[in-house]
Amino acid sequence: MEWISVWLAATFGAAMLAPPAYAEETTDPRTNVEHLAARVDAIDPATFPYANLDRAQALAADVPTGPFDQVVLHHLRVSLQRLGGGDAEGALSRLNGVRKLLEQTPDVPPGLWKVFWETYGIAALRLGEQKNCLGHHGAESCVLPLRGGGVHMEPGPANVARNCFLRCLEEFGDPTVADRWLLNIAAMATATWPDGVPEQWRVPPETFAPETDFPVFADIAPAAGVAASGLSGGSALDDFDGDGDLDLVVSSWGLRDPLRYFRNDGVGEDGTPRFTERSSEAGFDGQWGGLNLIHGDYDNDGDYDLYILRGAWLGQVFGRLPNSLLRNDGHGRFTDVTIEAGLFDEWPTHSAAFGDLDLDGDLDLVVAVETFPGEKPVPARFYRNRGDGTFEDVAEAAGLAFTGLVKGITLGDVDNDGDPDLYASRWGEPNLLLVQTGIGSDGLPHYEDRTAAAGVAEPIRSFPTWFFDYDQDGDEDLFVASFGGFEGDNLEPVARDILGMPSEGERCRLYRNRG
């Protein structure tokens, strides 16, 4: 699997980390939705790292004339781009051509054959997921261990994948835990696990046995009408239309993926809630993308408004997409008031939080900005709610102008003094605990860094985070998820961790508040 990591880094990394050409802040009179559309339309698919099919087409037209192994790796890279764009069948078609090339060439290094079979197995397994987990989606689809309705109804592609990974383990030496793991997944998909997996490669069923007596949750999304397909995104579950039941809003990270609103129509005779999509009626047309979203009643009118966060993971080259503040009229209909509220901003972000930081009775807004290494450091925003529907950024004066590749922020009263403190999860550097020291003579809350004293700087490559009282002693405890060692296609540490083997992956942290 290491060769694949090299190709993906070479393909994506340069585009993601290249020094950006900074754009000027937009000041023209267009609406926020028009700004968003213009930004998305201006992105060049030839350079955008996630426009995989465009990149595959460009790569396919530029076949190298160098050494044989470089030619093969080039074709494998094109196949992976097609796979990343969702075209598993196209990837396999090109891989079949690579196989013929390898078979017609004498003395092919075993390592090159192994990389080929790993790539072929991944493409076949993905095709099986598309045909089954998506094409025949049900409550047990893609839930490990695969069983019942999770077993593939069309097992052909997964069976091909099973044979590929078994070959990698048995024919080339130096077997990897990642190949072992994928062999077992493919066997589950074809109902040949565990007995159909050779004992030396078998992942024992007890690996998936629960360690505690914890309730099992069933996936009712298909029955409820909310099994929406999309990329990773955010969600908000609350009563947005004021009828007493919980509605659902979901975003999706794709540049033109729609924001979706599912209205709760009540519980059916079988006890399952029923939802109806009302995205256009909710005013969501043109509200594209967003890896995350939050909700809160910023205007104190008794209903929940939305804030959509955009640009995450895209850097300052591609992530200059405006966020959106959507005001709820109380009946599940929303209006984009970003510009009128003074919140127009185009720096990439993944993380924000509503909270009454200045204790004046209305919700303020903290928005963290993602800054990759080598990019212009852009500080977080602390938008103080003026109480008239508008905000002002006072982050510098309040001590909240922190920077970094921020992947999560959360508010909580860690010292039980009645005001909200802030924790920021930063990927690639120590995290921050900023404790409020009180309201100053300027009327602003003031914060100071207490990270070292509290001992909560890790994990260094962290991700989502939240405060909660896990031990029910009245103090806010802190959970910080890790992404260290698990980035991208790096399956090996994930599999090793699940199997109880030593792993390079960085551990999550649960910090108990000792009061």
Enumerate the predicted regions with their spans.
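N-terminal secretory signal peptides that target proteins for export/translocation
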Residues: M1-W3
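Bacterial N-terminal signal peptides
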Residues: S5-A18
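Glycine/serine-rich loop-strand microenvironments at binding/catalytic pocket rims
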Residues: Q70, S79
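Acidic, glycine/proline-rich Ca2+-coordinating loop motifs
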Residues: A23-V63, H74, Q81-G515
